[in-house]
Amino acid sequence: MDIVIDLEALSVRADEINVRKENKEVRDIAVKLKNAVREHGLASLSAPQIGINKRMFVINFNGDLRTFVNPIIANVKGFELSQETCSSIPGKRFIRPRHNDINVMYQTPLGKIESKRLVGMAAKVYQHCIDHLDGLLLSDVGLEIDELFDNATEEERVEVINMYLESLDIKQKAVEKDLEGTDEGKRLLSGVKFMEKVQKGEIEFDPEQESEGAGTDE
């Protein structure tokens, strides 16, 4: 199965899934995603990357392929710069800020709600997949790097990265200003502020309490 490389098509936010009503479709998508991950030797793959605009993806945990439906990030810790590639943007590398310790919630293909704590590479891959579901690409928000960057001095690389991080902050403030002008935007910003409180620990999230007996999917 071919991977979608049309960046315009991938810039659309994916639709949430009613697992109960769309159960057969969800199972079919999961099979297609897993087959594509195996075929191309990927760490992960989202439904939009195979031309299906639904909120689900598969992550390859050392050969154990897990399916995540309607996934969200409930809480985050830590921060680091991640060097990433994307099968939809072949031949290019990017630097992207990521949290390295996250609590997540999602549904299995059977509709069961589960929660997990992901750290390190697993956390970064999950965030990469969430970006795809939100129509956000590395080429939009990442810092593209090449041999010139690799061969630069450490001081030069730090300067480039700092300029990139400052530009991200400016973009975020511009988006927030635009959102404040609409009712929908105000509601979204209210949700963002709530999540920021969660991230700062002002509101606690207990994955064990939210999903007792969470197991593996499929």
PLM features per residue range, with description:
Residues 1-218:
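Positively charged
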